[in-house]
């Protein structure tokens, strides 16, 4: 909203300094500063409110050291992340941008599902929370919205061959590129570490009959649904010990922010020989606000946690990361960039699958890990949770660097 206000003041009254709001870098900086302020300053007030209303975590005894001490810790802290993200976005982003709209919808959609789950657990005293089938339906619903928007919306395009305009203006991330050239409506994505790294989803169906290329949405939309569901569940499983989900997600989000910025900049996309995605640079405002909210939330969520994000936060985080990866055409990089989420997910799948298999074969269930998800396995081995979290963050940073390298190494 401030963007439109200062744009008006610049055009009508030539207000000194109003032109700053034309620059993506300035608005991104303001977004992260404001989100950090909201999440740290007002986050404390929200935590006190949650504590006063006795909205606390009910902890099941899983035999983990220090677990029972966490009983009663305020939960639903994901609302801090959501509020600290949306306020800067509404103030500094271009609200007509389709990518910004999609991310706002994702935040509210997944936040509502997570909030309902936490509400049932906390107020209805049902430890299972929202039934799993309803969570999955909600995730599928979001995936359907994202998939249809990405495929059918006319403003979501790519451009492989760029035409250089004003190098100085673009390098400093001026808000808009004047001459973008022809835009292409397609379902192209990028394959990491491959020289000719562009992949068209329509090729999965067009080989049967070239005329089927118009039905590529039959392939593309289900893939988007799968990605949204998988990543949101991965983030949800990762939120098991203090600071793990928020810290790991901040690393992932900042990396995706870099991808969004270079993909939305005509000069850098040309220099790096990557796909230019018109209008995607505006996502940087959302990403910086979201990253600031996560870091601010960590102020209270690191060991010993003063608040838990609950499903309100974890499902929202996973949904946003999935949509960011899809929007920047980096969804095939998710197994690398979101490697922490992946191993947490796989540890649960392997544990459950092996237990069921051995029970059928030997009459008793056997386990691969002492406990799943993987972070609980290390807790069972006697590792302190703060050490586990920091080591997972280090792995996350390594995976983020590896992901960034794909911009140039093919």
UniProtKB/Swiss-Prot annotation:
Its main location: membrane. Catalyzes the initial step of the lipid cycle reactions in the biosynthesis of the cell wall peptidoglycan: transfers peptidoglycan precursor phospho-MurNAc-pentapeptide from UDP-MurNAc-pentapeptide onto the lipid carrier undecaprenyl phosphate, yielding undecaprenyl-pyrophosphoryl-MurNAc-pentapeptide, known as lipid I. It comes from the Bacteria. GO terms for cellular component: plasma membrane. It is found in: Cell inner membrane. Keywords: Cell cycle, Cell division, Cell inner membrane, Cell membrane, Cell shape, Cell wall biogenesis/degradation, Magnesium, Membrane, Metal-binding, Peptidoglycan synthesis, Transferase, Transmembrane, Transmembrane helix. Belongs to the glycosyltransferase 4 family. MraY subfamily. This is Phospho-N-acetylmuramoyl-pentapeptide-transferase. InterPro entries: Glycosyl_transferase_4 (IPR000715), PNAcMuramoyl-5peptid_Trfase (IPR003524), PNAcMuramoyl-5peptid_Trfase_CS (IPR018480). Pfam families: Glycos_transf_4, MraY_sig1. Disulfide bonds: none annotated. It is a multi-pass membrane protein. It catalyses: UDP-N-acetyl-alpha-D-muramoyl-L-alanyl-gamma-D-glutamyl-meso-2,6-diaminopimeloyl-D-alanyl-D-alanine + di-trans,octa-cis-undecaprenyl phosphate = di-trans,octa-cis-undecaprenyl diphospho-N-acetyl-alpha-D-muramoyl-L-alanyl-D-glutamyl-meso-2,6-diaminopimeloyl-D-alanyl-D-alanine + UMP. GO terms for biological process: cell division; cell wall organization; peptidoglycan biosynthetic process; regulation of cell shape. The keyword Manganese does not apply.
């Amino acid at each position: 909203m401030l963007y439109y206000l200062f744009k008006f003041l610049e055009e009508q009254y030539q207000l000194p300094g109003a032109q700053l709001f034309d620059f993506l870098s300035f608005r991104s900086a303001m977004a992260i500063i404001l989100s950090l302020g909201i999440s740290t300053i007002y986050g404390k007030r929200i935590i006190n409110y949650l504590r006063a209303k006795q909205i606390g975590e009910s902890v099941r005894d899983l035999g983990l050291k220090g677990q029972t001490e966490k009983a009663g810790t305020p939960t639903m802290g994901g609302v801090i992340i959501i509020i600290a993200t949306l306020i800067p976005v509404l103030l500094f982003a271009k609200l007509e941008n389709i990518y910004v709209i999609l991310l706002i919808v994702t935040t509210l959609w997944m936040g509502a599902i997570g909030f309902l789950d936490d509400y049932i657990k906390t107020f209805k005293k049902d430890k299972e929370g929202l039934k799993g089938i309803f969570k999955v339906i909600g995730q599928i619903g979001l995936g359907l919205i994202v998939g249809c928007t990405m495929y059918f919306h006319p403003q979501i395009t790519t451009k492989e061959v760029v035409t250089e305009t004003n190098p100085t203006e673009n390098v400093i991330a001026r808000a808009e590129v004047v001459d973008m050239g022809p835009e292409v409506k397609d379902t192209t994505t990028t394959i990491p570490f491959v020289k000719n790294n562009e992949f068209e989803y329509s090729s999965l169906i067009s080989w049967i009959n070239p005329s089927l290329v118009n039905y590529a949405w039959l392939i593309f939309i289900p893939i988007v649904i799968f990605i949204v569901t998988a990543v949101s569940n991965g983030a949800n499983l990762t939120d098991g010990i203090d600071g793990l989900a928020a810290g790991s997600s901040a690393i992932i989000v900042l990396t995706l922010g870099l991808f969004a910025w270079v993909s939305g900049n005509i000069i850098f996309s040309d220099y790096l020989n990557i796909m230019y995605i018109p209008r995607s640079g505006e996502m940087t405002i959302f990403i910086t606000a979201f990253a600031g909210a996560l870091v601010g939330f960590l102020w209270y969520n690191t060991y010993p946690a003063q608040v838990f994000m609950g499903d309100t936060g974890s499902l929202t985080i996973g949904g946003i990361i999935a949509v960011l990866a899809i929007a920047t055409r980096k969804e095939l990089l998710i197994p690398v960039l979101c490697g922490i989420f992946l191993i947490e997910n796989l540890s649960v799948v392997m544990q459950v699958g092996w237990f069921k298999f051995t029970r059928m074969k030997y009459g008793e269930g056997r386990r691969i890990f002492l406990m799943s998800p993987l972070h609980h396995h290390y807790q069972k081995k006697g590792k302190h949770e703060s050490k586990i979290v920091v080591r997972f963050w280090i792995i996350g940073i390594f995976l983020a660097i590896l992901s960034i390298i794909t911009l140039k190494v093919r």
